[in-house]
């Protein structure tokens, strides 16, 4: 069944790709500077001045954004691309599948490319591959996953772009499965947060991104264990940047992309996603993300409403919000606004009249 689903996904992605116009080269302006747009909301808590070009802090359950600095501006994602590679992979494979490496993957085993030193003909499980993809950021594994699932790398890339469109990404185009430099490979902080948010709905995705350490056992062509440890400082307890409640994420870096970082944190049943793009150093990206998480936890109160939650700036009362409701598909969807800014949503099933049964003949005779 999983194999049939995978083939259908490939055919659908190829069909969509044929119908879409060719993508033009992205006009990524690396010299542009952006303001913190959420600071312009009257009465909104002032957000931190991060050093990364762009950044966003999103509530995972609803996608509500509490902090936004150029979040819709295109930037090169580098290896945080692999979050989408992981999502498409877990949706179209099983963890016990056998992946045989070909020249497609092994050509990425070079001194200047992150890899796990695979060889042509080597066999790993999909579980091994997915952990190497996220923990080691292995480019050889990314390419091989793409070919294994898509039949060709390009077919898998088409699946990535189709999935991005389905999720609601509007400033993203993928040209490969690894994040290696390509002028036509770009995304935005908001889009990457949306992709990570979608992934968190999948149990296998959550397991892989939430694993800081993994051992690949000896294979048919490698007699040694491969011991993997997270590259994400905010996820590593021994790191000075470790953040309590971190549930994983992904690092990335190239010359053009600078340092990119996706991080998830859960505290008190509240999960936030922070994304920073084009940081100057990984340490600065970690400090930017930490500042955004601290800002959210210190300045907002998660308040329950009928059918959902809103995030109130501390000191703001629920009755000061504006509510806008509409009925769709048997539900009442309500948006809660702080001024004109959406800070929460709720969904409640509409009440229906329960028909009263007519008395039966037996009941009438009793």
Located regions from the model:
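Generic "edge-of-domain/loop-turn" microfeature
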Residues: 21-25, 62, 106, 272, ...
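Active-site-adjacent loops and short helices of periplasmic peptidoglycan-processing enzymes
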Residues: 25-190, 194-203
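Hydrophobic alpha-helical membrane context
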Residues: 17-18, 94, 292, 300
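Hydrophobic alpha-helical segments, especially transmembrane helices
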Residues: 4-7, 83, 267
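Domain-terminus/edge residues, biased toward the C-terminal soluble/receptor-binding domains
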Residues: 169-170, 181-186, 190-366
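Sec-dependent N-terminal signal peptides of Gram-positive bacterial secreted proteins and lipoproteins
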Residues: 2-25
């Amino acid at each position: 069944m999983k194999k049939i689903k995978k083939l259908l996904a490939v055919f659908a992605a190829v069909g969509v790709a044929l119908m879409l116009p060719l993508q033009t080269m992205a006009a990524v302006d690396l010299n542009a500077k952006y303001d913190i747009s959420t600071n312009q909301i009257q009465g909104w808590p002032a957000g931190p001045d991060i050093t990364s070009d762009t950044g966003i802090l999103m509530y995972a359950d609803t996608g509500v954004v509490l902090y936004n600095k150029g979040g819709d501006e295109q930037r090169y994602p580098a290896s945080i691309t692999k979050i989408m590679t992981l999502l498409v992979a877990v949706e179209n494979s099983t963890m016990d599948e056998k992946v045989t490496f070909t020249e497609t993957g092994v050509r990425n085993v070079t001194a200047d490319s992150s890899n796990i030193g695979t060889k042509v003909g080597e066999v790993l499980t999909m579980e091994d591959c997915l952990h190497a993809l996220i923990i080691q950021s292995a480019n050889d594994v990314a390419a091989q996953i793409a070919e294994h699932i898509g039949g060709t790398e390009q077919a898998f890339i088409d699946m990535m772009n189709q999935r991005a469109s389905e999720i609601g990404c509007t400033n993203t185009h993928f040209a490969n499965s690894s994040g290696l430099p390509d002028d036509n490979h770009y995304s935005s902080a908001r889009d990457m947060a949306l992709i990570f948010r979608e992934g968190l709905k999948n149990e296998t995705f959550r397991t892989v991104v939430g694993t800081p350490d993994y051992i690949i056992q000896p294979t048919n062509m490698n007699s040694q264990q491969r011991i993997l440890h997270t590259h994400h400082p905010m996820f590593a307890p021994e790191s000075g940047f470790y953040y309590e409640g971190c549930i994983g994420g992904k690092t990335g870096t190239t010359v053009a992309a600078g340092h990119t970082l996706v991080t998830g944190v859960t505290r008190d049943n509240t999960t936030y996603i922070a994304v920073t793009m084009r940081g100057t150093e990984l340490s600065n990206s970690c400090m930017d993300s930490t500042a955004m998480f601290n800002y959210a936890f210190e300045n907002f109160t998660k308040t329950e409403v009928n059918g959902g939650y809103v995030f109130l700036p501390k000191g703001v009362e629920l009755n000061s919000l504006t509510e806008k409701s509409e009925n769709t598909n048997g539900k009442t969807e309500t948006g809660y606004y702080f001024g004109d800014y959406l800070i929460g949503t709720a969904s409640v099933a509409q009440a229906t009249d329960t028909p009263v049964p007519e008395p039966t003949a037996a009941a009438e005779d009793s």
